[in-house]
Swiss-Prot record:
It comes from Bacillus cereus (strain ATCC 14579 / DSM 31 / CCUG 7414 / JCM 2152 / NBRC 15305 / NCIMB 9373 / NCTC 2599 / NRRL B-3711). One of its GO terms (biological process) is ribosome disassembly. This is Translation initiation factor IF-3. The keyword DNA damage does not apply. Keywords: Cytoplasm, Initiation factor, Protein biosynthesis. One of its GO terms (molecular function) is ribosome binding. The gene is infC. The keyword Glycoprotein does not apply. Monomer. Gene3D superfamilies: Translation initiation factor 3 (IF-3), C-terminal domain, Translation initiation factor 3 (IF-3), N-terminal domain.
Length: 167
């Protein structure tokens, strides 16, 4: 953003400190007006014909802008990915424990990656792993939506569940 002497246009459309239109003035007249008010001349619309400048306290303006940006960054929610590891031959109790953990993560707003690692000859029975992941996603259906269907990657199969937005 250009201020004061950085502005190169000969004529500018001037907006006063309180937002009122002051018309088209020469750059020097606008600079003198801003200096008399102990404020800065700030170029707000460089592509307009003639460019639009506003008389304001630039330091205060920058401070307000930075405050808004900081507030926006603070309000952004960071979604993290939690992983739950299952096996193709998982026992019922272990399955329920993993399921409870996954539901807890989803309720907190995190995504859950459920993965099954096939060891040894178990890779020949991918359909068993597929059934376990399908059962897992159905059990989490109340609090989640399937973001990516079960798919193989190397020796492991995984699916990603995202929390449901009930707002």
């Amino acid at each position: 953003m250009m201020i004061n002497e950085q502005i190169r246009a000969r004529e500018v459309r001037l907006v006063g400190a309180n937002g009122d239109q002051l018309g088209i003035k020469s750059r020097n007249d606008a600079l003198d007006l801003a200096a008399n008010l102990n404020l800065d001349l700030v170029l707000v619309a460089p592509n307009a014909k003639p460019p639009v400048c506003r008389i304001m306290d630039y330091g205060k303006f920058r401070f307000e802008q930075q405050k808004k940006e900081k507030e926006q960054r603070k309000n952004q929610k960071v979604i993290s990915m939690k992983e739950v590891r299952l096996s193709p031959t998982i026992d019922e109790h272990d399955f329920n424990t993993k399921l409870r953990n996954a539901i807890k993560f989803l309720e907190k707003g995190d995504k859950v990656k459920a993965s099954i690692r096939f060891k040894g000859r178990a890779i020949t029975h991918k359909e068993i792993g597929q059934r376990v992941l399908d059962r897992f996603s159905e059990a989490c259906a109340e609090v989640s939506t399937v973001e990516s269907k079960p798919k193989m990657e190397g020796r492991s199969m995984f699916l990603v569940l995202a929390p449901k937005n009930d707002k």
